[in-house]
From Swiss-Prot:
NCBIfam families: PRK00630.1 (NF001884), PRK01002.1 (NF002169), PRK02967.1 (NF002815), PRK04460.1 (NF003381). InterPro entries: Acetolactate_synth/TF_NikR_C, ACT-like_dom_sf, Arc_rbn_hlx_hlx, CopG, CopG/NikR_regulator, Ni_resp_reg_NikR, Ribbon_hlx_hlx, TF_NikR_Ni-bd_C. Binds 1 nickel ion per subunit. Coiled coil: none annotated. GO terms for biological process: response to nickel cation. HAMAP family: NikR. Keywords: DNA-binding, Metal-binding, Nickel, Transcription, Transcription regulation. The keyword Protein biosynthesis does not apply. Pfam families: NikR_C, RHH_1. Belongs to the transcriptional regulatory CopG/NikR family. This is Putative nickel-responsive regulator. One of its GO terms (molecular function) is DNA-binding transcription factor activity. Ni(2+) binds at residues 79, 90, 92, 98. It comes from Trichlorobacter lovleyi (strain ATCC BAA-1151 / DSM 17278 / SZ) (Geobacter lovleyi).
């Protein structure tokens, strides 16, 4: 972590009031922490858009395990990308549905491609990809 630098910003009072309500609702101790988090989030987003930065992500999906060969297809996809898939969690939600959460590491482009492939497999009811930086910025 580098030296702390103080700086001032000019902001519309209505926007500041909205921001203050937001940071109170989210439990921030002060504006500085909230602004630091916004800056970090923007930097992570830039890395995702670049496509070549190392990222980590989770793919969460729900599927009906009775769909023919679906579990085998999903497992095969994971094995095809064994360098990127670093962990998997499988949960039986009920007699028919399963939740699977995969943790992936690689470039954002690789992770997005793998997620698209998995979520596009026939029988996957729904799912979502969450990406973040594998190299966190300073606190």
């Amino acid at each position: 972590m580098g030296d702390i630098t103080r700086f001032g910003i000019s902001i519309d009072s209505d926007l500041l009031d909205s921001f203050d309500r937001l940071i109170t609702r989210k439990g921030y101790q002060n504006r500085s922490e909230a602004i630091r988090d916004l800056i970090r989030a923007t930097i992570v987003e830039e890395k995702m858009d670049a496509g070549h930065e190392e990222m980590v992500g989770t793919v969460t999906m729900v599927y009906n395990h009775h769909v023919r060969d679906l579990a085998d297809k999903l497992t095969e996809h994971q094995h095809q990308h064994h360098h990127q898939v670093i962990s998997a969690l499988h949960v039986h939600l009920d007699a028919h549905n399963c939740l699977e959460v995969l943790v992936l590491k690689g470039s954002s482009a690789e992770i997005k491609q793998i997620a698209d492939e998995l979520l596009g497999v026939k029988g996957v009811k729904h799912g979502k990809l969450f990406l973040t930086s594998a190299t966190p910025e300073h606190h």
